[in-house]
Structure formats: C-alpha cells, structure tokens
Amino acid sequence: SGLDSLSGATFGGNR
C-alpha cells in the first residue's frame, strides 16, 4: 500500500 500507515508511507510506500 502507498499511504497505508505512518510506517507504510516510508518503506511500505515503495511497494
């Protein structure tokens, strides 16, 4: 996900 969460916006945003 892109902006799923604060953490997701960092490394998870790449996926």
Curated annotation (Swiss-Prot):
This is Tachykinin-related peptide 10. Brain. One of its GO terms (biological process) is neuropeptide signaling pathway. It comes from the Eukaryota. GO terms for cellular component: extracellular region. It comes from Rhyparobia maderae. Keywords: Neuropeptide, Secreted. Its main location: secreted. It is found in: Secreted. Myoactive peptide. Increases the amplitude and frequency of spontaneous contractions and tonus of hindgut muscle.
